[in-house]
Swiss-Prot record:
Residues 95-119, 199-231, 263-299 are annotated as: Disordered. This is Transcription factor PCF7. Residues 210-225, 268-278 have a biased composition (Low complexity). GO terms for cellular component: nucleus. Residues 58-84 form a coiled coil. Forms homodimers and heterodimers. One of its GO terms (molecular function) is DNA-binding transcription factor activity. InterPro entries: TF_TCP_subgr (IPR017887), Transcription_factor_TCP (IPR005333). PROSITE patterns: TCP. It comes from Oryza sativa subsp. japonica (Rice). Residues 140-198 form the TCP domain. It comes from the Eukaryota.
């Protein structure tokens, strides 16, 4: 204790404190030395020729990694530049047709820029041009492509009819080919001579359009000749009747629009009255079987004039109290024609406008006006023309003025029994007799169906 209080003791304490502070100072110096040593070691480690192998190996590994990263970055940069260039090329090719077009804007600046992305389909379409069909990128078979021919693109696949396909596969089996195209090639080779004789498409003659227009006229002329009843001037009378047929049609119905076949059902009374005597003489001098001979040459399904052969089916159920409209009294020279023409009659309650009685299954016979027949007897009934539900109400507007005009224009000198046939298809063939003949189509008389009866239009 005394030592701590004296002077020496104080010095000892100071020495103790100095001793404690000395290690602190060494520690700071050591740290500075270590930093200098670390710097030296780092500077030595960067040198590959140093004696320290560990430091040199780590440095080389680091440098190699950095080099690989630099190469990868360079490759990515090149790929990006290539994509940029290809995208700009596509944009240029897309804008080029628009600038060439008539309404394309010629500006076409680089505004907006290219996205740098392109699809394989766009690239192929650009490379091969528009309108071409290219196989898929996977190289699959192109089963739906078309071939370019002289008349444009056509499908490669050909669809055959059933019987044609059966015959073709039979030929293929007989030839022993495994593919239909080989059989087609064989057929083309064997038919080469016939194919060479065919004209080219440009040299092929046009289809005869005039033949289709001349065919109805030839048919009409043949019909008028066969039903002219011995008239040598049937062509002239037919043309005159067709020219004057529109005079009886009302103007409101548009007579100029009505076809010649409809006009032929209504021959002019002036032409009929002018040729009444000639037609009556020709009709009188004709043989009794003229009707059967003239109608046998035509098809029953088309003209419906085989009334004589089918009269046992058509008129078998008509009542016996109906009087005959055509008799042999007014036509001398036909002694045996009265029995043959008995079937051409109309019931007593039938009117002059051609409406038959019964169940509505009647035939229209517009007969010449007799002496003493007034207009009240002609239009005794005001009902429209009917035929088994067929809409013939529109024909009333044609028949009424025709019948009235026939009454006013028929000469009084014509006998009541004189009968002449008006031309049914082409005009007035035999004079002022029947003004029309209409046979309704597909009528049934008590369960029996008429065969080959149609309406002559």
């Amino acid at each position: 204790m005394s030592g701590f209080t004296n002077k020496d003791g104080r010095q000892n304490l100071a020495s103790c404190f100095n001793f404690r502070s000395s290690p602190f100072r060494l520690t700071v110096g050591e740290r500075e030395l270590k930093l200098e040593e670390d710097k030296n070691q780092l500077s030595k480690g960067l040198d590959p020729w140093t004696s320290n192998p560990t430091a040199s190996a780590s440095t080389l590994h680091y440098l190699l990694q950095e080099k690989e990263r630099a190469q990868q970055a360079h490759e990515q940069l090149q790929i990006y530049q290539q994509q940029q260039g290809f995208g700009s090329f596509l944009q240029h090719r897309i804008r080029q047709p628009a600038s060439r077009g008539p309404g394309g804007g010629g500006g076409g600046g680089d505004g907006g820029g290219s996205s740098g992305e392109s699809t394989p389909v766009e690239a192929l379409a650009t490379a091969f041009g528009a309108g071409r069909i290219v196989r898929s990128a996977a190289g699959r078979k192109d089963r739906h492509s078309k071939v370019c021919t002289a008349r444009g693109l056509r499908d490669r696949r050909v669809r055959l009819a059933a019987h044609t396909a059966i015959r073709f596969y039979d030929v293929q089996d007989r030839l022993g080919y495994d593919r239909p195209s080989k059989a087609v090639d064989w057929l083309m080779r064997n038919a080469k001579a016939a194919i060479d004789e065919l004209p080219d498409r440009a040299e092929a003659p046009p289809p005869p359009a005039a033949a289709s227009t001349e065919q109805p006229e030839a048919t009409e002329q043949a019909t008028s000749t066969s039903y002219g009843f011995g008239n040598t001037t049937g062509g002239t009378m037919t043309s005159a009747a067709s020219a004057a047929a529109g005079s009886f049609l009302p103007h409101s119905l548009g007579a100029d629009r009505v076809s010649d076949s409809v006009k032929s059902l209504f021959p002019s009374s002036s032409t009929a009255s002018g040729a009444a005597s000639a037609g009556h003489d020709e009709y009188r001098g004709s043989p009794p079987d003229l009707l059967s001979r003239t109608t046998s040459n035509q098809q029953p399904q088309e003209l419906c004039l085989t009334l004589q052969s089918n009269q046992h089916q058509i008129f078998s159920h008509v009542s016996s109290n109906h009087h005959g409209m055509i008799s042999s009294a007014g036509v001398p020279g036909w002694p045996d024609h009265s029995q043959r023409m008995q079937a051409w009659h109309a019931p007593e309650n039938s009117t002059g406008d051609g409406r038959g009685g019964g169940n509505g299954d009647g035939y229209m016979f517009a007969m010449p006006s007799r002496q003493g027949l007034d207009q009240s007897q002609l239009f005794s009934h005001g009902e429209p023309l009917q035929s088994s539900g067929r809409g013939w109400a529109s024909a009333r507007a044609w028949l009424d003025p025709l019948a009235v005009a026939a009454i006013h224009h028929q000469p009084s000198t014509m006998a009541a029994g004189q009968v002449g046939f008006g031309h049914l298809v082409g005009g007035a063939g035999g004079g002022g007799g029947f003004m029309g003949f209409l046979a309704p189509a597909a009528q049934r008389l008590e369960g029996e169906e008429e065969h080959g009866s149609e309406v002559i239009r």
